[in-house]
């Protein structure tokens, strides 16, 4: 699973996921299913945000990569992926500027068009149950919830899906492709079932025991299927800015 994640996702997303796990004392090399889930969630958050801007009249518009619209304001502020202190700083700044109610839990995005925080969910389980769990945890009508599944289903607060159909279809297609690629490598069942994942982990650890001290040969080749899987949606200029913003070390 770890090799699949590193091949499948944008390097910046992998780096952010590793950083988030280490912040909570988790090891991406051991908890590989969680590693994959965090990368998937991060990618959906970025895809949700990318190409969506607000023009000078306050209207939401879609701008594809390469268009000369650098002065447009991004519609969504990305909160997910930042370290907790920085994330709360961003949330507090938004609340102070807009007057919106401060959430009890860190949301994933802020929508400047609708003036609301957004909680993004990506589930391997039954979507209605997952939505109810999210809503029960957040306990706030001010935070908008939008859930996607790997089967192409989605569910949102008051059936308000925020994005246009094409943008949502891009997210659903990406999730379905990830599922198919996992399945073709025999990874999907353990990704869906925690019990199966634990069994697979024990099996992997047992296989590693006899050669723990041996050097590991790593292949850096990417299969043709993974080349098509590599996300092409990220705006290169924004990627660089996000990397600088999200990954910079805090000053001591």
Swiss-Prot record:
Site location (Important for efficient shutoff activity and nuclear localization): 195, 198-199
Signal peptide: none
Disulfide bonds: none
Domain of life: Viruses
Keywords linked to the UniProt accession: Decay of host mRNAs by virus, Eukaryotic host gene expression shutoff by virus, Host cytoplasm, Host gene expression shutoff by virus, Host mRNA suppression by virus, Host nucleus, Host-virus interaction
Molecular-function annotations in GO: RNA binding
UniProt keyword Cell membrane present: no
List of catalytic residues: 80, 108
Compartments (UniProt record): Host cytoplasm; Host nucleus
UniProt-annotated site: Important for efficient shutoff activity, residues: 202-203, 206
Gene Ontology terms describing biological process: viral RNA genome replication; viral translational frameshifting
Family, per entry: Belongs to the influenza viruses PA-X family.
Domain notes: The probable endonuclease active site in the N-terminus and the basic amino acid cluster in the C-terminus are important for the shutoff activity. The C-terminus acts as a nuclear localization signal. The C-terminus is recruited to host protein complexes involved in nuclear Pol II RNA processing.
Function, in words: Plays a major role in the shutoff of the host protein expression by cleaving mRNAs probably via an endonuclease activity. This host shutoff allows the virus to escape from the host antiviral response. Hijacks host RNA splicing machinery to selectively target host RNAs containing introns for destruction. This may explain the preferential degradation of RNAs that have undergone co- or post-transcriptional processing.
Protein name: Protein PA-X
Organism: Influenza A virus (strain A/Chicken/Pennsylvania/1/1983 H5N2)
């Amino acid at each position: 699973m770890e090799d699949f994640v590193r091949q499948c996702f944008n390097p910046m997303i992998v780096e952010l996921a590793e950083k988030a796990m280490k912040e909570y004392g988790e090891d991406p090399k051991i908890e590989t299913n969680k590693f994959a889930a965090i990368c998937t969630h991060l990618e959906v958050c970025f895809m949700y945000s990318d190409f969506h801007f607000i023009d000078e009249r306050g209207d939401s518009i879609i701008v594809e990569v390469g268009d000369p619209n650098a002065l447009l304001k991004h519609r969504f502020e990305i909160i997910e992926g930042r370290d907790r202190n920085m994330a709360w700083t961003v949330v507090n700044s938004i609340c102070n500027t807009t007057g919106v109610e401060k959430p009890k839990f860190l949301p994933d995005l802020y929508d400047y068009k609708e003036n609301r925080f957004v909680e993004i969910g990506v589930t391997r389980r039954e979507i209605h149950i997952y939505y109810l769990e999210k809503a029960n945890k957040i306990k706030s009508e001010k935070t908008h919830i939008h859930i996607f599944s790997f089967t192409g289903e989605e569910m949102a607060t008051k059936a308000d899906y925020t994005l246009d159909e094409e943008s949502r279809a891009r997210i659903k297609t990406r999730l379905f492709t990830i599922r198919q690629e996992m399945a073709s490598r025999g990874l999907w069942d353990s990704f869906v079932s925690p019990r199966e994942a634990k069994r697979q982990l024990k099996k992997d650890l047992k296989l590693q025991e006899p050669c723990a001290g041996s050097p590991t040969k790593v292949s850096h080749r990417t299969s043709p299927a993974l080349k098509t899987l590599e996300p092409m949606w990220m705006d290169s200029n924004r990627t660089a800015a996000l990397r600088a913003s999200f990954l910079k070390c805090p000053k001591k």
